[in-house]
Amino acid sequence: MLYMIGGSPCSGKSTIASLLARQYQLLHIKLDNLVDEMVSQASADSQPICLLRQDRNPEEMADEEWRFYEEIFPYVKSYLIKNQNRPLLVEGAGLLPHLVKELECQTSSYLCLTPTADFQKKHYRQREWVPYVLEGTTNPEQAFENWMQRDILFAQMVRKEAMKLGYSSLVTDGSQPENQTAEEVARLLKLSNKNRINI
């Protein structure tokens, strides 16, 4: 059993997946936690974006983010194959709809979660590591704004592709409690109530 939450950065994927994994007894896999290993594998295989990613900051990578996820997807796919007998809830921006389509899973097993621009900016500012990413720039505020614009565009691209390919898409704006958003995601993913436990 495989369920996937893709979408764009800072949309609440990890929070929602964590809640659902506990509730539905699924193993929560964060692609972000696997990226370093996958980048190392892809770099060893001479994938161009992965080679560049080692030495570039996020602003320089804006145009390459989409291709970066395409480059590491064979490693994501390999990971999923190795763990196919486990009940997984995998989440991450690297689960691009056209790549997920290659897995030939039911469309209900994938959801695209993207934030409104305001939600994204608010929650990025709360992440403790963001200042460290920006500290080497000459204009941190402009660099942050460019980064946000890149991710806003990425959200639009991934949402449009999900809808085109027939996948469910949900936009988060922070107006409802996390557990309510989690219930909506569970409904869209058609998570089985027979596996559900109350927490």
List the model feature ranges, each with a label.
Residues 14:
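Walker A/P-loop
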Residues 90-136:
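ATP-dependent NMP and nucleoside kinases share a basic, alpha-helical "lid"
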Residues 21-32:
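Post-Walker A helix-loop "phosphate-sensing" segment adjacent to the P-loop in P-loop NTPases
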Residues 153-199:
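NTP-dependent small-molecule kinase module
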Residues 10-11:
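ATP-binding Walker
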Residues 5:
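Hydrophobic anchor at the beta1->P-loop junction of P-loop NTPases
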Residues 27, 40-87:
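Conserved nucleotide-sensing/catalytic segment adjacent to the nucleotide-binding pocket
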